[in-house]
Amino acid sequence: MNFVYNTPILNKINIPNIQFRAAENYAGTLAPKKDSFSTNPLYDNFVDRNTLTQIAKSNPRIMELLKSNQVRLDVNIRELEKLKHGHLMDTRVTAAKIYSALPQNLKSEVNLMDLQQAAMLHDYGKVLIPDKILNKNGKLTDKEKEIMKLHSELGYELLKEQGVNENVLNLVKYHHQTPDGNGYPEITNDFKPDISSQILAAADKYSALREKRSYKDAMTRDEALAVIQEDVTNGLIAPEVYSALARI
């Protein structure tokens, strides 16, 4: 069964009224989790600042994106390590749990290994976003928002030709894109709004909402789920994915 995203869902699908589990000691800063992805070779091959700098310098698209937005090339390894043991790991765990709670007919459409690798790499491009923007106290300006949005494509460009398969690359590139194509970056023929992209989008947003960051407090579990339920109403997240998230 192929999952269809572009059909209207408002007033047609009843989302189950689920008793949400109480939040469990979620302080907003995640301790490293020790499992097979904690030492993912996709990270270990990219932790050297000089190597990443050379990869970026040799990639015309990366240099074009940075230059056109007046961003100086500067590899922020500390941010990458923070993400590795925090938001990225949490997104990976959440995505895997969503997958496990899906109906079997939808599970068959997902490559779980690709999904988990994409979750661990989806914000990789933030290594090239200035720290003063990533960790700014307060709201970003319109210009800063545009620079922040570059991270999806920057991550894609950093990872391509480095042994990352096409499915993972596209999930990284389009993790902020929506089924109707109104997200970012601009879609091309490689955009595939499939069930995996929906799982990654939900897991990414849930993790971000639950974390305390420099510009916001952490939401409770119920608050975060309420925000994502609005995305379901607006056709941005598949209802089956939301139901799976709410059950974990």
How would you label these PLM feature ranges?
Residues 46, 51-248:
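Histidine- and acidic-residue-rich, metal-dependent catalytic cores
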